[in-house]
Amino acid sequence: MTQMTVQVVTPDGIKYDHHAKFISVTTPDGEMGILPNHINLIAPLQVHEMKIRRGGEDEKVDWIAINGGIIEIKDNVVTIVADSAERDRDIDVSRAERAKLRAEREIAQAETTHNIDEVRRAKVALRRALNRINVSKK
C-alpha cells in the first residue's frame, strides 16, 4: 500500500517525521483530507488540529496542535512548516489553561480600552491555547 512521508517542522526543529496513509489539516478554505498520490499543492494552514493516520497493522492515529504555517504536498511527501506545533502527548495542559485564562483577560482589557490590535492579538493567543487544550484531549 502506498504511503506518504509526513514531516512537521517548526523554528525549533523537526516535531514529527513518520509515514502515513491519511492526513487531515485545516486551511482558510476549510478542512482538507490528504491521501497518498495527492496532487502537488502548497496552502496556508489555520490554527487547528492535525490528524495523522499511520499505516501498518495498528492503524495508530497521531494528533498535533498546529499553530499556523503552510503545507506542501509533493510526490507523497507532506511537509508542514508551522509557527509552532505540539503532539498531543507533549502538551502541558496546565500551561495551556493558563494561556487561555491570560488571553481571556487580555481580550476583556483590550475591549474596555477599544484597542482593536490588542483584541486581535489576544484572540489569536486564545485560539492557540484552545487548540492545544483540544488536542491534548484526543
Curated annotation (Swiss-Prot):
Localization of this protein: Cell membrane
A cellular component annotation (GO) from this entry: proton-transporting ATP synthase complex
Gene3D superfamilies linked: ATP synthase delta/epsilon subunit, C-terminal domain, F0F1 ATP synthase delta/epsilon subunit, N-terminal
InterPro entries: ATP_synth_F1_dsu/esu (IPR001469), ATP_synth_F1_dsu/esu_N (IPR020546), ATP_synth_F1_esu_C (IPR020547), ATPsynth_dsu/esu_N (IPR036771)
NCBIfam families in the record: ATP_synt_epsi (TIGR01216), PRK00571.1-3 (NF001846)
Entry function: Produces ATP from ADP in the presence of a proton gradient across the membrane.
Protein name: ATP synthase epsilon chain
